[in-house]
Amino acid sequence: MSFTTKVKEELIHLSTGDNNELAAIIKLSGSLGLAHQSLHLSITTENAKIARYIYSLIEDAYVIVPEIRYHQKTNLRKNRVYTVYVEQGVETILADLKLADSFFGLETGIEPQVLSDDNAGRSYLKGAFLAAGSIRDPESGKYQLEIYSVYLDHAQDLAQLMQKFMLDAKTIEHKSGAVTYVQKAEDIMDFLIIIGAMSCKEDFEAIKLLREARNDINRANNAETANIAKTISASMKTINNIIKIMDTIGLESLPIELQQVAQLRVKHPDYSIQQVADALEFPITKSGVNHRLRKINKIADDL
């Protein structure tokens, strides 16, 4: 199950459901038609549970019994499209929800009352997400929530509504419509709280925190690996110089304190400077070890 489906199925099991939610669903996934000189309303979805939920919203609010139809886009079950079909009382529904324009079409913007009332706004956003929303799987680490609208003015109104709840919502226009979206993980979690998907919000946050912890561990491991590689690279240069001294004047020709450091460096090329300092018979500071190594390198360079 995708994360989007998980959110939507949590939403339809909430006890709340009102006309603002239904208005958003109809506006974003509904269409009007004319049959036998009367209007009919079709609301489409690819989720059977959402279709039954829309059916219940209409039946409970208007004592109208819709019909659920379906057809197959392909032979794959997941491409089955469900239509909640209403052929009675459509004018009443449109008038009550303030959805009809003067040309018997659907109004493209959002009612001012929805934009000004917090509770109405929450319900509308819930319906909008159920109808045309999606969230990129948080496991991907690339966060995005978007709601598709047929009309740009609706997408812009939707962004305005989301901005009212302090979300950094933006819109982008496509050939076939417009998208309202947010891309910050914190905004997506806040949106889930606004529409009531608390369980999915907690799941999203847990996945986000786990990814961040993994990334921190990987960064630490990469830094440690880089430091080890740097240490070995530096120590190999010194080891080559020590071998040069051994092959020419002999290690025993060096002062005893340089011999001890040289022997440890050859024996443990992976040791950090601090580890070399700690391993000496009479431990010294890191700067003391560095000073002795520089002396060894200088002697080798002069040979």
UniProtKB/Swiss-Prot annotation:
A Pfam family found in this protein is: LAGLIDADG_WhiA
Q: Which domain of life is it from?
A: Bacteria
Instruction: Give the GO molecular function terms.
Output: DNA binding
SUPFAM superfamilies, alphabetized: Homing endonucleases
Q: Which GO terms describe its biological process?
A: cell division; regulation of sporulation
What InterPro entries does the entry give? Homing_endonucl, Sporu_reg_WhiA_N_dom, Sporulation_regulator_WhiA, Sporulation_regulator_WhiA_C, WhiA_LAGLIDADG_dom
Name the DNA-binding stretches: 272-303
Keyword annotations of the record:
Cell cycle, Cell division, DNA-binding
* Biological role: Involved in cell division and chromosome segregation.
Q: Which family does it belong to?
A: Belongs to the WhiA family.
Q: What is this protein called?
A: Probable cell division protein WhiA
Which gene name does the record give? whiA
